[in-house]
Amino acid sequence: MNNKKTATNRKGMIPNRLNKFSIRKYSVGTASILVGTTLIFGLSGHEAKAAEHTNGELNQSKNETTAPSENKTTEKVDSRQLKDNTQTATADQPKVTMSDSATVKETSSNMQSPQNATASQSTTQTSNVTTNDKSSTTYSNETDKSNLTQAKNVSTTPKTTTIKQRALNRMAVNTVAAPQQGTNVNDKVHFTNIDIAIDKGHVNKTTGNTEFWATSSDVLKLKANYTIDDSVKEGDTFTFKYGQYFRPGSVRLPSQTQNLYNAQGNIIAKGIYDSKTNTTTYTFTNYVDQYTNVSGSFEQVAFAKRENATTDKTAYKMEVTLGNDTYSKDVIVDYGNQKGQQLISSTNYINNEDLSRNMTVYVNQPKKTYTKETFVTNLTGYKFNPDAKNFKIYEVTDQNQFVDSFTPDTSKLKDVTGQFDVIYSNDNKTATVDLLNGQSSSDKQYIIQQVAYPDNSSTDNGKIDYTLETQNGKSSWSNSYSNVNGSSTANGDQKKYNLGDYVWEDTNKDGKQDANEKGIKGVYVILKDSNGKELDRTTTDENGKYQFTGLSNGTYSVEFSTPAGYTPTTANAGTDDAVDSDGLTTTGVIKDADNMTLDSGFYKTPKYSLGDYVWYDSNKDGKQDSTEKGIKGVKVTLQNEKGEVIGTTETDENGKYRFDNLDSGKYKVIFEKPAGLTQTGTNTTEDDKDADGGEVDVTITDHDDFTLDNGYYEEETSDSDSDSDSDSDSDSDSDSDSDSDSDSDSDSDSDSDSDSDSDSDSDSDSDSDSDSESDSDSDSDSDSDSDSDSDSDSDSDSDSDSDSDSDSDSDSDSDSDSDSDSDNDSDSDSDSDSDSDSDSDSDSDSDSDSDSDSDSDSDSDSDSDSDSDSDSDSDSDSDSDSDSDSDSDSDSDAGKHTPTKPMSTVKDQHKTAKALPETGSENNNSNNGTLFGGLFAALGSLLLFGRRKKQNK
């Protein structure tokens, strides 16, 4: 059986058949997962390394003291400067880089407008670094890392999950009890490949040595690899000891809290830095109880101790002891002090708590005489706090007090702050001091120290600018800052745990596992990490059990697929997590023990049916009546909520249809209108008796639905056929036989005048009026047959024998009038009113037959010795008038179709038997017969009267 679900089958049911479901099963090999854990083994997760950049513009033509010019160092020389100031800034000034979480770059610029003399010095100083993992996570010094691990370990499970803890081989008590004070395990933490490196670094072109330029973006980085013995337990300690010239941090002082983190932000060891002893003591957390074979590497930002390493271009022994492993390296330090500059500044340190900049400014190191000397400080992103009274002005009494590290021993300086007025302006962002203080001239030298506090309302990166305005012009110096990160890694073989439990059939749908309820085999279960990444998948066994193995402590997500034919039961029913259902998706937390409480329950999904009836609504009222029948063969389509066709069927001989094996949900039923039928009215009465229309939306909720009906009626058609057939036949036959034999010796004068008038008038009138008005179906057949037969027979027999010797004068006047009048009037009126289809056929057949037979036989025998003069004049007038009038009026008023077929036909039923040869139009047939009949009758009469006249004589 193929259990693979395609994208198509996944969307809906198979049309018009029972949907059968089988539980799918994947055979998945369970693989043990060895999780490599990344550790951040660094110092002071709360500290940011600061790199200081200083740029100065001087009023000297040349500066004999070498100054760093490779990195952000420029010097402009004023042509009006005295020739003794011929020092040129070189590229031998230092730049220091330290791998703390932030490097603050300070740039100092000293400008003198008239002279255009510029010297640029870049100084990078670093504070303590926050150790980062391989994912480059940065922890700033100001962040309290002590709460980070707690936040990471908070379970995201939406309900309380009971976890069965497994006792460990060691430290089992420590997993539930407060950590006990451990012992120093410096001998169990082993460091190799220790190095103190200068990040970036600058090469002295004269000596070829790489130097650490503390104020030019260089940083120092302490690097090492390490391993931790498995015997180390929570609460044990180890130390980092820094030497006389080396400390953690950067320009920013190291914070007291120095924690070590792993890649996920979990605390491995908590460190406390003691600035007096320059030592950090670390205490292991229970991380070491959860992992074995822990090893790693780290990179930590560090900085020269400015109060001890005070002189530029001097190699200091940077020494550190990690655990019991000691390492030292000579590092040449240069802070970039330019003794010929009349104005130069540097950041002494950045306070770790409030991030204030503690600045040191050297004024008039060359000891020149000024007649004008105004010192101005402009802050960007910072503010002064006049109430703090930390703007100090010291008078230098010994040239050696200008130490290169900008960290003078102020106890040996003369504090003259009270002699000057510091004028604050620009919302305490500008401070101005007149260093002449009313004197006409002065060559005094000053060291000015001030504190600049971050301006929280500012969005600028921050900058501190200094200006010294003298009679020779302006000199300026600028300090700016940027961040630099350190990093570290660590890994170990983590202790492994299991997660899983059970998928069961909840037959009573109460959301709880009962003793008689069984597991469901073949349910897919997917395991994901807290970020939603799939880690593994498996399938429940024949008992409904599943398990994921080889898992580390952490938060996981478990997803259950709904087996075919089932519905998820109620989740989190009751208070016992061990026997309830956790739903389709749940969260499980592993914390030093297996978690076998993640269950899910399902019950078999009941199947439902829908359908009913399609009927012929003969009275078009939209309601099913007892006399109305179903319509067979109507196509019905079923769609799911997505509009996908999931079934088609046709109504049976009773108009019934049905769809089965349906889940609860939304569907659409579509009826296809049969040809020749019209949709009846919808929703006219009760739902189980009315019509629902061509498309019906229906929702099945735990029940069948057999109320989905539809009705149709026949389309309106009227057919009216009116046929009128009128046949008029007039047959007039006149036969005249005259035989005259005259023998006369004398004189006979015979005058015969025959006037025969035959008038045949046949009038056939057929009037058919068919009026049909129908709404439905009416078949009306009207047939009118009218047959009129007129037979007129006139027989005249005349025999005349005349024998005369004398004059015979015969005057015969024969008047034969044959009048045949046939009047046939057929009136057919058919009125049909039907509801649907009206077919009116009116057939009117009128047959008029007129037969006129006139027979005249005249025999005249005349014998005369005399003169016989016979004059026969025959005038025969035969008038036959046949009038056939057929009037068919068909009026049909119907809703659909009304064909009207009028037809009028005159039929000659006797034409074959009796008709004379045609000598004219068909209407003159009877007239010709009458004419000849009259002529023969007249001739006969003439002979008859001739004979009589002869006899009379």
From Swiss-Prot:
Location of the motif LPXTG sorting signal: 916-920
Residues forming coiled coils: none
Compositional bias per record (Low complexity), positions renumbered to this chain: 115-132, 918-933
GO cellular component, one term: extracellular region
Chain intervals with Acidic residues compositional bias: 685-695, 712-892
Propeptide, chain numbering: 920-953
PANTHER family reported for this sequence: TOL-PAL SYSTEM PROTEIN TOLA
NCBIfam families the record matches: LPXTG_anchor (TIGR01167), MSCRAMM_SdrC (NF000535), YSIRK_signal (TIGR01168)
Biased composition (Polar residues): 56-71, 84-114, 133-160
Annotated region (Ligand binding A region), positions in chain: 51-495
UniProt-annotated location(s): Secreted, Cell wall
Family: Belongs to the serine-aspartate repeat-containing protein (SDr) family.
Membrane topology: Peptidoglycan-anchor
Record-listed Pentaglycyl murein peptidoglycan amidated threonine modification sites: T919
GO biological process, one term: cell adhesion
Basic and acidic residues: bias regions: 72-83
Signal peptide limits: 1-50
Biological function: Cell surface-associated calcium-binding protein which plays an important role in adhesion and pathogenesis. Mediates interactions with components of the extracellular matrix such as host NRXN1 to promote bacterial adhesion.
Keywords on record: Calcium, Cell wall, Peptidoglycan-anchor, Repeat, Secreted, Signal
Gene3D superfamilies in alphabetical order: 2.60.40.1280, 2.60.40.1290, Immunoglobulins
One family name in Pfam for this protein: SdrG_C_C
Disulphide connectivity of cysteines: none
Residue span, CNA-B domain: 496-606, 607-717
Organism: Staphylococcus aureus (strain N315)
Quaternary structure, from the entry: Homodimerizes; via N2-Domain. Interacts with host NRXN1; this interaction mediates bacterial attachment to host cells.
Name assigned to this protein: Serine-aspartate repeat-containing protein C
